[in-house]
Amino acid sequence: MSPGAFAVRPADSALKWPVRHPWLVTLGSSLVPVVFTAGGFAVAQVRGLDDLGTYLTVAAAVTVSALVGLLIMWRARPSLTDFGLRTPRNAAGALWWAPLAAVVALVLLGSGVAVRLAVVPAIVWLTLAVGLNEEFFYRGIVFKVMRRYGTCRAIVYSALIFGVLHLANLGNGSSAGYLILQVVFSALFGFVTAELVAVTGSLWPGVAFHAAYDTVAYLGGDSSSSTALVSLAVQVVLLGAYGWWLWRRLPRAEVSA
C-alpha cells in the first residue's frame, strides 16, 4: 500500500454519505449494536435464564438493533442500494467467496459441535441477526460515512473500530492474551468484509459470511482447544491473504492517485 493510494478520495461522490459531523455519527452508530447486545445479555443474566433463554433474549435484542440500522439507512440521503443492499457484482474479483467458505469450514473442523440440539434454532436466529446487525452498522453506515476520507482509509478506520469494540468482551472471563487475539482477528474480519463491500458493492456477501462464521463458532461452544487455536491461526493467514487479494481488486479510481 503506497501513501498516495492510502490518501486518495473516491472518484464517485455517491460513495460517500455527506453528514455534518462524520466522526460523531460514526462513533454513535458504532455503539448501537454494542448497547443492544449488552442489554440483551444483561436482561438474560438478571432473569437467570439458561443458555436457550439467553440466546433467544439476545437474538431478540439484536434483531431490534438490526431494524434500527435498516431504518437509519432507509431514512438517510443515500438509497438502500447505495448502502449495499443490492445484488453483489464482480464475484470473480472476490474469488466467488471461496476463501470465506474455507474459513467457515476451518472453524467447524477445529471446534466441531458442542451444543445441545435444542439450542441450535436459537443460535441460528441469533447469528443471522448479528450478521445483519453488525454488517448494517459497521460496513453499511460507518463505512459509508468514512468513505468521505477515501475508500482505503474507510476500510482501515471501520476495521479498527470494529476490532476495538470487541474489547466489550473484557468482562467475559477470557485471558488477556485471548482477548487481544480476538480483537486482532475482529479487526481483520472487519477489514475483509469492508473490502467485500468496496469490491462487490453489496453487503450481502459479508452478511452471509458473518452469520455462517458465527453459527459454526457458537456450535463449537467457543472452544479454546489446541486444535481450535491452530485452526484460528490458519484462519488468520487465509483471511490475511484474501484481504491482500481484495485490496488489489479495489476499483482503480479509488486507490490510484
Give the positions of each predicted feature.
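Alpha-helical transmembrane segments
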Residues: 21-38, 93-105, 155-161, 238-239
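Juxtamembrane helix-entry segments on the extracytoplasmic side of multipass membrane proteins
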Residues: 112-124, 171-185, 225-229
